Amino acid sequence: MKKRYNAILLLIFFLYLGQVNAQQIDQVYNQKIKDFTTDKRFLPQSLLDLVVHPNIPSPLKHFGHIIGEEGHVHRTSEIYAYYQQLAETSPMVHMQEMGETEEGRKFYLIVIGDEKSIQNLDQYKTQTALLADARKTSVEEAEKIIETAKPIYYVSAGMHATEMGAPEMLMELAYRLVTSEAVHIKEIRENIITVINPVSEPDGWDKQVDWYYRHTKGRELFDDGFPRSVPYWGKYVFHDNNRDGLQVSQAITKSIFKGFFEFHPTVMLDLHESVPLLYVSTGTGPYNDFVDPITQSEWQVMGNHDVAEVAAQGMPGAFTWAFYDGWWPGYGIWVANNHNSNGRFYETYGNAGADTYLRDLSTSRYAGDLATSKEWYRPDPATPQVLWSFRNNINYTQTGVIASLSYAANNGKMLLRNFYKKGFNSVEKGRTEGPKAFTIAKAQRDPAMVAYLANQLMVQGIEVHESADEYLVLSEQPYRNLLVSLMTPQAYPKDAKFPPYDAIAWTLPNLYGVEVDALGELDGKNLSSYKLLTEEVKYDGKVDGSGNAFIHTYQAQNNVLPALYALKQQNKNAGITVLKKTESINEKVFPAGSVIITKTNLNQIKQLAETFGLDFEASSADFSRFEQKSINLPRVAIYHTWYNTQDEGWSRYTFEQRGIPYTSIDKDELKAGNLKSKYDVILIPRVRGNAKMFINGVDSKFGPMPYTQTAEFPSHGVPASTSDMTGGPGFGGIEHLRKFVQDGGLLIALENSAAIMAELGLAPELSPVSSGSLFHPGSIVMAKVRKSSSPIVNGYPEEFSIFRGNGPLLQTNKYNRDLMLVQYGSKPLKDEIPYEGPILGMTDKPKSEKVEAKEEKSKPYVVAGMVRNEQEIIGHGTVFNVPVGRGNVLAFTFDPLHRFLNHHDAPMVWNALINWDGLR
C-alpha cells in the first residue's frame, strides 16, 4: 500500500514537471523547501516546481534565502521592495498604494494576472462594479458582462501580527503565479485577477518582526510562558483589528474597504493562524440571517473543495466546520459577505515566528471534538504531537490558496453570476418585502449622533437620502440585507449547540442612541423631496436667544465634555457650571446636567456649537438662584498593563476621537506614587486576568524585557515605551492607587477591571457574585436607573439599553444598595422584593393592583442578541459608586467604551469626568 501511495505521488510530481514546458526548475530553492519541511506529508509535490526565471528574481535570489527558512522573517519595507521588483520585472504585476497606517507606514495591493488583465485592469474593475448594482444592470446585460469579465480574487495576510506565515508565503506565491507555466497556474493567471494584500496591518507586523528578532528567536520551547506577541500591534487596536468592520475606525479597515469598493472582488480570502493544521472556514452556525443563501452554499462548496485538494496531495490535518460560527458581521473580511461577495478565511497552525517546535495537540478541542479525532469534517487528522516548522506553515497555506484560486479560475462565470444574483436578490427583497425604508429624524437628543449614523451607513456603501428634517434610507438597493441587519434587532437562537465566536448583537440605533422608524410601506412619502447624499454630513449646532450666559440642554450627548475641554483651552476664564437637578428657566425645562457657560462671548459659543454639534440658548436669566455645580475639568490618566492592551487601546482611541485629553500610564507610574498631584481621574479599561495577574504583570523571571525604540528595533517604543515590561505595580503600586482615591481622586474601572479592583479591596463594599448558569454573550439589554440623583446618569431616562458581554458581576450587601446607581433589567433582586406572605401578629395585606400592573409592564431584558438564564443577572448592579476616603471608585460591570461601538453607553463615563469631584 505504501509503495502504491509513493508511486502515485511520484506520478503527480512528473505530471507537474511536464506542465512547466521545459522551464528550468530551481533545484536549490526546491531542495531548501524540503530541508525546512519536517515531514514529507507536509510537503506536496505540487510546490516543488518553482522555476528559475532569467529576469524575475525569486525570493532566494532577492533575499539570499527561501521563504519559510528557519530564523528568517521580513519587515514591511523588505516585503514591499520585493513586490516592487516583481512589478518592475514582470508585466503581469501591478502594485498600487492604498493609504497609510496610523504610524505612517504604507498599505499596498499587488495585482497579478496575465498581461491582458493588467493592461485592461480598469475595464475589469468597471465590469465588476456594474455587476454589483442590479438596478443599473439588467439580467441580460449582466450575462453579456459575465462573458468577458474576470473574477477578482482578493487574498490578504498579516492582519494579526503573530500570525507570521502568510505575509511571507504570499511573496513565494506571487513569484510562482508570474513565472510558472504549469497548466493550473496558467489557468489562474489567465482566468482570474488575483489581488494580494501583502500585510494588512503593517504597524503590527513590523513590531512583531522586531519582537521576534529581539526576544523570541531561537527560544528552546514554545510553551515556556514567554510572551510570543509584542504588546502592541496597531497604534490603538490589538486583535480587535478584525472586529472593526462595523465601525470602520482603524486605518487597516479603511484600507480593506477601499480595496473592496475599488475592485468589487468576487471572493475575499483572509489568511490567519491558530488551529492545527489547516482550517478552511465554513463555521458551525448559526449563520447570520442576512447572508444570502448563495453565499452560505459557496462557503460549503469552496471549503470542501479546498480540503479535498489538500487531502488529495497527501497532507493530513485539513478540516472545515468545527471552528467559528458565521454570525457576527464585523470581521474585516466580512466586507465581502455583507456586500454580496464571498468572504472566507484560513487558520493555519503557526509558531508565531520562524522556529521549529514540537507541538502538543492532544488536548485541543474544537466544537467539542479533539483536534486529532477523525470526523466527517476532518477525514485525515494530525497526530497528537507534531514537529512543526515555519516552512510547514508556508506549505499548507500556499497549497490551500492555490487550490482556491484554481477553483475560481475554473468556475469564474458561476462566481460572477452568483455575485450579480446576490445583489439582484437584495434589491428585489427591498422592493417586495418590508421594511421598505428607514427614516431617521434629525431633531433628536443627540443630533451629532444622528449624522454619525447616516455617515456610518454610507461608509458601508448604503445609499442615504436627506430632506430638511430627516434622513431616508430606502431598502430597494444592493446592500439592503446589510441595511436591515444593522438597523433591526438580532435574535440569536437560544438553542445553538456551540457558543458564539464573538458578540451576537449590533443594532446600530441602540448602540448609538438614535431613534429610527422602519416603514412597512412608502405611502405618503414624496421621494422627489429627498436628495441622495454624496458626502459626509455634519450637524452644525445652533445658538438661539440673547444674553450673556449660554445654556445647553443636557441629554447625554457625546460631545459635551470635549466641547468643555475645547472651551477651556480657548478661554481659561470661562465659567462652567451644571444644574444639579431639573429646573424650569424662562418657562423651559432644563434637566440635571444642563451646562451653563458664562464669561465668554457669542462667537466662542457659535464655534463650539458648530464644531461639536451642540445647541445653546443665550439667556439673561439670573442663574444664581438655581442649584449648580462648578465644573473643574479633570486631569485624566488611562492605565495600561503590559500583558493586555486591547481595551486600553480602544479607550485611548475613543478619548482621542472625542478630543478628551489624557495621559497614558503604566505600572511604573503606580509604583512611583504621588498620583493625586498629577491626576484627578484614573481610568482602568477592561483588562483580562485576576488580581494576582494585575499585581504581578508579566512574569519577572523573563526580565528585563525592553520595549524601547532603538536603531536595531525601530518599531518598538510605540505607542508606549519601557525598559522592562516584566513585573506589575506590586502591592506598593496598589497602595499608591488606594491613596490616590483616599486623597480625593476618582478611580473608574470597567468590566473585569472592576472585579479586579473589588478583589484588591480598593472598592471594599463590592463582592463578586456567582452568576450560576448565566450565559451572556455580547448583547444589547435593558438597564434601569436606581439612583436618579447621581450625576452619572444625567441625560439618561429611567430605563435604557446598553451593550454587555460575558463578564463578572459585583454586588453589595443589602444595606449598601444605595451604592448601586444602575441595575440590569427592570425587576429588583430577590432579596429586595417585599415579603407578601402572612406575618404572625399582623393583619394580612392583599397584593395591590398597582404592583401587579407594574409587574406586567416590565420590559423584556434582551433587546437584541440572546441571554440564557437572564434571571441570574436581572436586578444586579450595572454601575456602582463606592466612596473611599475623600474619593470614589466608580465600578462598571460592563464596558461602556467597547470597540468604539456602543456610543450610547459612553456618556456615563463622560458624566463621571464632568462631575468627578461631586459624586458624594
Where do the model's predicted regions map?
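Short, solvent-exposed turn/loop segments enriched in Gly/Ser/Thr/Pro and often Arg
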Residues: 198-201, 212, 271-278, 753
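Carboxylate/His-rich catalytic cores and anion/metal-binding grooves
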Residues: 174-177, 191-214
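Bacterial Sec-dependent N-terminal signal peptides
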Residues: 1-24
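Intrinsic-disorder/low-complexity accessory segments
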Residues: 23-193, 237, 243-244, 249-251, ...
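Conserved beta-strand positions
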Residues: 270-271, 684
